[in-house]
């Protein structure tokens, strides 16, 4: 497959054996780039992965949402948008189809400004991180997304949690890979399990990880 651009029109060409498929790209920049992210921490969570993870939990805003290792705030922002039923691409600056000859700007503006599908969010999203720099970045992204009213942030290590808002769900993406040693990683998950057992009673917890031994350290199964 290949891609070419002719006067702002992106054409995808895919050749397989004797078949050739031509398609016009109506999106432009990848749709996983929502448009609200103005800065990011090291190894930020992909926006689509964050949204998919939240949707997998079944949560749609019927309780508080907590991310105690929030980094640049992606899970918090996607959670608030899901709770409010805000269209995920609403913050994008442009789409490729806006440069098409038959682009209907009036129709696009009418659809873009239609908020009839949005809903109230009676609870709140709470985020924290051990890093002041991460919280500063998350704050900028949340402000860019226009969600300051729905998300609370603070600099706070997970192990310092002594209470949790009720009712609630916890969804988080702990540090991994080169950012943390194997020994510290297992210690981190042991601490996560301890906090879940003593502070987040009654919660459902969804944690993104890549090692089964990490979940073993949580010790809830």
Locate each region found by the language model:
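Conserved Class I SAM-dependent methyltransferase catalytic core
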Residues: 122-124, 128, 132-136, 162, ...
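Short, small-residue-biased leader/transition segments that mark boundaries at the very start
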Residues: 1-6
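Hydrophobic beta-strand segment of the Class I
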Residues: 170-171
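Class I S-adenosyl-L-methionine
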Residues: 14-56
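Glycine/charge-rich, flexible interdomain linkers and switch-proximal surface loops
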Residues: 7-15
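Conserved S-adenosyl-L-methionine
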Residues: 45, 49-162, 178
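A short, flexible beta-alpha/helix-coil linker loop
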Residues: 29-30, 175-179
């Amino acid at each position: 497959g290949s891609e070419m651009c002719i006067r702002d029109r992106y054409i995808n060409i895919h050749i397989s054996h004797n078949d050739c498929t031509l398609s016009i790209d109506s999106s432009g920049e990848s749709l996983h780039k929502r448009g609200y992210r103005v800065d990011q921490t090291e190894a930020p969570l992909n926006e689509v992965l964050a949204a998919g993870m939240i949707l997998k939990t079944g949560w749609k805003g019927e309780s508080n949402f907590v991310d105690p290792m929030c980094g640049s705030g992606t899970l918090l922002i996607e959670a608030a948008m899901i709770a409010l039923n805000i269209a995920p691409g609403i913050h994008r600056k442009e789409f490729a189809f806006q440069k098409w000859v038959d682009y209907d700007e009036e129709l696009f503006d009418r659809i873009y400004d239609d908020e009839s599908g949005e809903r109230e969010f009676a609870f709140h999203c709470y985020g924290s991180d051990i890093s002041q720099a991460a919280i500063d970045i998350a704050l900028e992204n949340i402000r860019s997304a226009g969600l300051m009213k729905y998300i609370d942030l603070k600099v706070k290590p997970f192990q310092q949690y002594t209470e949790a808002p009720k009712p609630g769900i916890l969804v988080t993406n702990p540090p991994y890979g080169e950012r943390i040693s194997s020994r510290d990683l297992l210690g981190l998950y042991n601490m996560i399990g301890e906090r879940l057992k003593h502070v987040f009673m009654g919660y459902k917890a969804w944690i993104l990880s890549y090692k089964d031994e990490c979940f073993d350290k949580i010790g809830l199964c």
